[in-house]
Amino acid sequence: MAGLPHSPHAVVTGAARGIGREIAATLTRAGAVVTALGRQNAALEELIARGDARFSAVADVTDQAAVVAALKEAAARRPIDIMIANAGAAESAPFAKSDAALFKRMLDVNFMGVVNSIQAALPSMRKQPFGRIVVIASTAGLKGYPYVSAYAAAKHAAIGLVRSLALELASTRITVNAVCPGFTDTDLVAGSIDTIKKRTGRDHAEAMAELTRHNPQGRLVSPQEVSDAVLWLCGEGASAVTGQAIAVAGGEI
């Protein structure tokens, strides 16, 4: 299987924890030069100290000006070849109680954060002979789940962006894809389990079962399984794969 080209520069947003941290480490092990972007400088520096990233960039993906400045600095160090738009957040509420502020928060980070990251990276990427854009979406971008209508709407929007941008860039050497994890063993899902316990009175095992029942394999996905899918999409062997939303969810989708 064809791997990464020689030492590409990859920017990973939301790299301080969870799936983003695993993606940064996986790409680094595969030979990429990784810039880890996030809001928490201490966590990013820890990533670098472990050897799982080369550079850090502090920015909130919802702040367009901050993202542009951070990626301009990153591109000055080394032109950008790979953009992994991973940063995201989830909140749950019944639709009737999902106010405009909740929808705006979910769209700002899960959709506009993706837009801001890609737009800031593209000027550098267009000058390169190789390019990969991978958006970390969710199975919630491919189907519905109750009580997360704002989150699901934002993830559906992100996948729509991927499909449209892939066609727009098809004549270039830049591919655009989404990876859509099911419920994954991260802090974000741990928070969801705590929420289920508080709202329903269920114990940990029962709350976990509420999530794993969606996965035909009866388990949570691991961050490494998600990062392995990302690594494949970033490789030269995936040059003909673009505009796809690939579920990593044990057969749920």
Q: What does each model-found stretch correspond to?
A:
Residues S138:
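Residue(s) in the substrate-gating loop at a strand-loop-helix junction
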Residues Q217-V248:
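C-terminal substrate-recognition "lid" of short-chain dehydrogenase/reductases
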